[in-house]
């Protein structure tokens, strides 16, 4: 994996052209021994070549360019691209009319000169944290990949599965994803990437197919925190500056205990413990936090969270007409929303507001909270693909920690904290909503300490 800053430096120095970078990415996508056919639902080669050539021409003419200019980027296939049909990883939408305009997030990427390589595969309608897709195939996690039998490979995490693997496999430098319950942070954790979930509303969802209008947020998956920071600012319509890294000396980091650490795989527990020791040795002040309200949130959301009723409203007619074309596991989750009563939805809004107030008070003494992004290492695709029980159990486990902070409208990162050669493990660094810039600055300081300790932070 390469960082945006590294690629931009090579482009500026003339060591490589945007067209050369793009052709390398397209070759990886087309490689029959690779994951390209499962990573992308569509490849936009012609428009990407035009964008790469335009970036090269501007650079040659001495035009001042953004850090993303001429850089290959992938876009999750729930963002509208003008002239293309948005499928959201489903067969149901294949024959729908093409989008009349780009989603606003895509408009901002194009305005910054990014080269949109293609639309990436995802969990159907973004409604699972596993990344399994029966319609377009499931991209294999880069860790412990099986060349002989893709089902013996490991899940990439979801729902932004293709976005993650596109970056991990060098098909893109940044992948644009969405995070409603963890769909950026889960695949980032399982694939050894960095993923950023911003405060809801920081980046416009205009032109993005919704899962939950209450919870949907848009975020990048990339190699480093700086990559996420510059991408986030471009997506938010801000100047593409990277905040200066915060030194760890004296930072107050709360380590969440209890519910969020139940049932950790040994590899996750070991990597998380090593990360905590590393940050403490670097001068951060770590203190255990027991915020009991977290374990109550799954009870509040047991009937389908905000996602089920809000998603059902969007899908109601499609399900009546074409339910047989849905992945049954996804259709079943959406249909839970049919049974949510108005008073239950209103009560959930009230419970969320109260939980956010309680969380803000508990968070006040800290600069960030730390916890494992997910409790498990990536299981094999075959273990989940053939068992509804296993699928449901692991999906709940994968979403457990990340979804808490969608409910609380936090902002934060998943950073790789494993050693090279080990199963990827993510360290989640979270803050309350509205602290995005400080979170990205703090994340760079944490990333530097982890890198110095030999953790597998890509550069």
Question: Where do the PLM segments sit?
Answer:
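Immediate post-signal peptide segment of exported/extracytoplasmic ligand-binding proteins
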Residues: 55-72, 246-254
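An N-terminal boundary/leader segment
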Residues: 1-49, 57-60, 281-282, 452-459
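Residue-level signal for inorganic ion chemistry
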Residues: 25, 48, 228, 253, ...
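Serine-dependent amide/ester hydrolase catalytic core
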Residues: 8-9, 57, 104, 315-407, ...
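Short helix-loop capping/hinge segments that flank enzyme active sites or metal/cofactor-binding pockets
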Residues: 68-91, 153, 250-252, 305-360, ...
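Short glycine/serine-rich loop/turn segments
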Residues: 68-215, 258, 371-391
């Amino acid at each position: 994996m390469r960082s945006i800053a590294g690629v931009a430096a090579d482009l500026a120095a003339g060591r490589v052209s945007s067209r050369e970078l793009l052709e390398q990415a397209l070759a990886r996508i087309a490689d029959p021994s690779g994951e390209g056919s499962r990573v992308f639902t569509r490849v936009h080669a012609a428009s990407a070549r035009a964008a790469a050539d335009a970036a090269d021409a501007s650079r040659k003419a001495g035009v001042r360019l953004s850090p993303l200019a001429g850089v290959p980027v992938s876009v999750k296939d729930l963002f509208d691209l003008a002239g293309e049909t948005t499928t959201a990883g489903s067969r149901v939408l294949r024959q729908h009319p093409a989008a009349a305009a780009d989603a606003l997030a895509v408009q901002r990427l194009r305005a910054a000169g990014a080269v949109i390589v293609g639309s990436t595969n995802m969990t159907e309608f973004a409604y699972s944290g596993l990344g399994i897709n029966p319609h377009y195939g499931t991209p294999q996690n880069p860790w412990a990949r099986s060349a002989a039998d893709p089902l013996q490979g490991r899940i990439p995490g979801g729902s932004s599965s293709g976005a993650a693997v596109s970056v991990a496999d060098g098909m893109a430098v940044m992948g644009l994803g969405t995070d409603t319950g963890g769909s950026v942070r889960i695949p980032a954790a399982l694939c050894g990437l960095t993923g950023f979930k911003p405060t809801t509303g920081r980046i416009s969802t205009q032109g993005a197919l919704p899962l939950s209008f209450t919870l949907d947020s848009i975020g990048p998956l990339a190699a480093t925190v700086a990559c996420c920071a510059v991408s986030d600012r471009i997506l938010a319509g801000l100047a593409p500056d990277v905040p200066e890294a915060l030194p760890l000396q004296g930072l107050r980091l709360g380590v969440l205990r209890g519910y969020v650490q139940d049932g950790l795989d040994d590899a996750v527990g070991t990597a998380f413990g090593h990360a905590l020791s590393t940050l403490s040795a670097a001068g951060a002040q770590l203190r255990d936090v027991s915020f009991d309200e977290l374990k109550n949130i799954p009870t509040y959301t047991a009937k389908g969270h905000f996602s089920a009723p809000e998603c059902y409203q969007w899908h109601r007619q499609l399900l009546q007409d074409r339910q047989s074309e849905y992945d049954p596991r996804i259709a079943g989750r959406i249909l839970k929303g049919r049974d949510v009563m108005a008073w239950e939805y209103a009560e959930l809004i009230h419970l969320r507001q109260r939980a956010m107030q309680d969380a803000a008070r508990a968070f006040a003494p800290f600069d960030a909270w730390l916890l494992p992004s997910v409790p498990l290492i990536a299981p094999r695709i075959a273990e989940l693909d053939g068992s509804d029980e296993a699928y449901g159990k692991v999906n709940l486990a994968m979403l457990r920690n990340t979804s808490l902070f969608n409910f609380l409208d936090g902002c934060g990162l998943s950073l790789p904290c494993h050693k090279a050669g080990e199963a990827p493990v993510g360290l989640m660094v979270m803050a309350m909503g509205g602290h995005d810039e400080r979170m990205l600055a703090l994340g760079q300081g944490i990333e530097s300490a982890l890198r110095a300790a030999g953790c597998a932070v890509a550069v």
